[in-house]
Structures are given as structure tokens and as C-alpha cells.
Amino acid sequence: MKFHKNEKGSILVFSTVTMVVVLLFASLAIDVGCILTARNQLQSAVDASALSGSIGLIIDRSEAIHRAILMAGMNTVIDQPVALGADQVSFPNSSQVRIEGNHNVNLFFSKIAGIHSVNISGVAVAELGTIIGTNGMRPWAIPDLGWPSGSPVVLKAGDINADSANPSFYYCIDFPPIGSGSPVTGASVYRDNIIYGSSCEISIGDVIQVEPGNMVGPTAQGVSDLIGMDASAYWNGKKVVNSAYPANSSPRIVKIPLYDPYDYPHPGRKTITVIGLASFFLMGGHGKDIMGVYMEKVTSGTFGEGYSFLKGTRLIL
């Protein structure tokens, strides 16, 4: 088939236009992909910022804002750090932090159409709630005596002069709770639970078997190993400082169940009932006792309503 010159010209023009359109759509697809990637990265950044900010609510709103801004800056959108201002952090209520982030994304090929950049946004809300069940508990249960923050507390009694201790109960307990499996007894398991914490979850209302005896040797071994994991950390009167771990995550911050001091194990009684959960910075031995400092801790676990000093944070938007 032969084409006239004008037909050949028309085909050439059509082919050129088609190629330009295809290239334009391909270019736009690249920019759209860039925008979608940026949106996902920004959302991840504001999520992390909200969670970090909600942890700061344990102290006050100023700390929440500081942590939120700091965490945002540790994230990037298309290799650029996320900039968050204090005016982008708000508080829907006393336990929630809302983050409204935005970021300007430079485009590549859309500049041909006169579009040089787009502004994307992301919103996240996180709340600080009460944890009523968690794992990682140490094998001690102590009487709830209503300590103020920073108070020294006996975590493991060394003799019967401690509150509600007796010749067969020095605050030592076995895991798992009754009804969740057979409680595992013995010195080596008890020692390992001091070092690493329980693998099972302990919740308010659980009934826990008492480990009889003073367990002097296993206690000393376990406490020594645990302190050795973060030996430089210490309590400065307000918080844990000089830790080798990020804030609030030293292994020496231990979680312990509480029981009613008026409902303690008398000689012959083999269980305690968990009425609350709390956390302490492990100091070490003081005389025959093992001591800690009462403090609040953010941890993972089951959220709910109950008598617990453990806090958790989660996204709700």
C-alpha cells in the first residue's frame, strides 16, 4: 500500500502526539507513585509522633509536645526529615495526643504541566491508657501500701519483719497463674524469672501460687544478673538516668503484681490474689531485703479499667 506525502505527514504527527501523551502519562504515574509513597511515610511519621507524645503525658503536656516533635524529626518523607511544630500538637482530652502533620513534596515530571509540588497531610491520635494485664512480670508479689512516686519499696522480703511476710512467704511467687496452666516451681525457674520476667501474662484478678521459702541464693544471683544488664543506670530522685537503654526501657524497671495487705498469705495459705500492677526501678540489696523505687512505666499489654499503675499507648485514629 502506498501513502501520499500528506498521509505520511499525518501519521508522523499522530505518532508523535501519541508518544508525547504516553510519556506524559508515564511521567504522571511516576509522580503519583512518589506522592503515594510520601503519604505513607508521612502517616507513619505522625503515627510514631502521636505514640511518643502520648508517653510524655505521664509527665505533662510540655513533655508530650517535646517527645512528639523529637520523634517526628527522626522520620523522613522522601529522604527529608519531618518538621513538626508545637501548634501541630493538640490534646483532645487529658489522655490523648493529636498530631496534624504536613509536608511539601517536590514533583519531577509534572512540572511540564506547571505543577511543581503538592502538599500532603496526615493525622494521628494516640491515647495513654491503663494496662490491666501484661507479661514480663518478676516473680515477686508485694502488698499495696499506696506509695508516692519515687518511694523506696521492698520488692523481696529478706526476713519476716517486712510487711505481711512470714516464715513461709517472702514475696516470692510462681508462674503461670492458677487456671492458666500448672505453676512452675524451683530455684532455677525463679532465678530466670527475675532476670527475664515471666513469659505468661499476669492480670488483675489472677490467683497466683506462692513460692515458699526465702530463696536467698537464687534471688541474689538473679538480681545481680539483672542489675548487670544496665549497671550504670541510677535513680536521680526523679527518674532513671545514665541508662544504656532508651528512656523508660531499662531492664531494671521491673513490673510486679500487688496484693491486698489485709489479705496476705498466712502460714499454710498457698496463694495471693492480684489486685493491681505496678513498676519499680530495681536498686539492689539493702540489708536482707531487695529494694526498688516506685515509678510509672509504659508497657505493652491488655488495656482496660482497673487498679494499675502500668500505662500503655495505642493509636485510636
Q: What residues fall within each predicted segment?
A:
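Short amphipathic secondary-structure patches
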Residues: 36, 40, 50-108, 130
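Alpha-helical assembly-interface signal, strongest on the long, hydrophobic N-terminal helix that forms
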Residues: 1-70
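Flexible, membrane-facing loop/turn or short amphipathic-helix motifs
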Residues: 108-116
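Residue-level signature of catalytic and energy-coupling elements of molecular machines
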Residues: 9, 31, 72, 99, ...
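Proline-rich low-complexity regions
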Residues: 21, 106, 137-139
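N-linked glycosylation sequons
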Residues: 88-95, 116-317
